[in-house]
Swiss-Prot record:
Designated name of the protein: Tryptophan synthase beta chain
Pfam families, alphabetized: PALP
Annotated CDD domains: Trp-synth_B (cd06446)
Family of this protein: Belongs to the TrpB family.
Cofactor requirements of the protein: pyridoxal 5'-phosphate
The species this protein was found in: Bacillus cereus (strain ZK / E33L)
Enzyme Commission code(s) on record: 4.2.1.20
């Protein structure tokens, strides 16, 4: 399969690109240049690997979920344990890389957006480590849902700005973070939390997250002497999925499954299934699939999981859908909750609600596969942050 994206203009087929105001163009080009240099610099790679190993705690285990496998029948189920990273999710793979890049570029301050608070915590963490000033924008609805993470960020020295505009969720936080970056561009680096935004952000985030898929490949081959038949990951903006899928893109014998949030159901208005129900448009500097109405107004995304309710999806996922290399599906709030409880009871592992969407789809897929086949789930984060809202949800039901 001939797959080499993005092109030199930052496009993934028709997707991606750089739809930014003139005031940001220079910074985006400067970032691209700095990133290219860093990727070719052995000292930078060495420093990044040092922190990934000694600070983040990589590599993360590939765990054979024996009880889940027995329960489902069919394929052997493996979990890539990104929940065991420092700060409890995959987000830090990207924030540590971008923070080192910020230091290299001589920036003193970092700005970021966050939905579930995981990216905010991971950003505040690396800023504390590297002595960078940190400002985090978070929608007020998410601030309410994720009180604990807000306090965590503040403990780490970050300034958390609550965003009341729009629906007070991730999309609005990104708007404000971009606005802040425009006016502080001389001394500030924007750490984008997912494979979104203008080029080179989708590529930078994908590359820093690719450590997930690279490790998985190596670990699975060591255990089973072959590649897995299927790989499953959840998708909001799509960074854990992109990090897991990208190293497998050329291995056409490996089926890749991306799982979006169907919320209350894709037939309702309350979902975040962008690739299932969306259409092409431009948001936050990039062309991609979006949830929008006929007039092109962005629709509110809904999911029980704060990390999946973004109304767009990364440009590379948009392309992978169109060329059929990845097959995209969606899982409802209720199905995700069921999977959350099942994994907790069967394996003693409490997954994030985001990751529970991937688990739920894998539960449907595994029984249709053969016993000598393998399925890997990207367990993108741990569920401590969700226990309170799950308790509330179950009491209401």
């Amino acid at each position: 399969m001939n797959y080499a994206y993005p092109d030199e203009k930052g496009h993934y087929g028709i997707y991606g690109g750089r739809y930014v105001p003139e005031t940001l163009m220079q910074s985006v080009l400067e970032l691209e240049e700095a990133y290219k240099e860093a990727m070719e610099d052995e000292a930078f790679q060495k420093e990044l690997n040092h922190y990934l190993k000694t600070y983040v705690g990589r590599e993360t285990p590939l765990y054979f979920a024996e009880n889940m496998t027995e329960y489902c029948g069919g394929a052997k189920i493996y979990l890539k344990r990104e929940d065991l990273n420092h700060t409890g999710a995959h987000k830090i793979n990207n924030t540590i890389g971008q923070a080192l890049l910020a230091v290299r570029m001589g920036k003193k301050k970092v700005v970021a957006e966050t939905g579930a608070g995981q990216h905010g915590v991971a950003t505040a963490t690396v800023c504390a480590l590297l002595g960078l000033e940190c400002v985090i924008f978070m929608g007020e609805e998410d601030v309410r849902r994720q009180k604990l993470n807000v306090f965590r960020m503040e403990l780490l020295g970050a300034k958390v700005e609550s965003v009341a505009a729009g629906s007070g969720t991730l999309k609005d936080a990104v708007n404000e973070a971009l606005r802040y970056w425009v006016s502080h561009v001389h001394d500030t680096h924007y750490i984008m939390g997912s494979v979104l935004g203008p080029h080179p952000f989708p590529q930078i985030v994908r590359d820093f997250q690719s450590v997930i898929g690279k490790e998985t490949k190596k670990q699975y081959e060591a255990l089973e002497g072959k590649l897995p038949e299927a790989v499953v990951a959840c998708i909001g903006g799509g960074s854990n999925a992109m990090g897991m899928f990208y190293p497998f893109v050329h291995d056409e014998e490996v089926a890749l499954y991306g799982v979006e949030a169907a919320g209350k159901g894709v037939h309702t208005e309350k979902h975040a299934a962008t690739l299932t129900k969306g259409s092409v448009g431009v948001l936050h500097g990039s062309m991609m699939y979006l949830l929008q109405n006929e007039e092109g107004q962005i629709q509110e995304a809904h999911s029980i999981s704060a990390g999946l309710d973004y109304p767009g999806v990364g440009p590379e996922h948009s392309l992978l859908k169109d060329i059929g290399r990845v097959s995209y599906h969606s899982i409802t709030d209720d199905e995700a909750l069921e999977a959350f409880q099942l994994l907790t009871k069967k394996e003693g592992i409490i997954p994030a609600l985001e990751s529970s969407h991937a688990v739920a789809y894998a539960l449907k897929l595994a029984p249709k596969m053969k016993e000598d086949e393998g399925l890997v789930i990207c367990l993108s984060g741990r569920g401590d942050k969700d226990v309170e809202s799950i308790k509330r949800y179950m009491e209401e039901v």
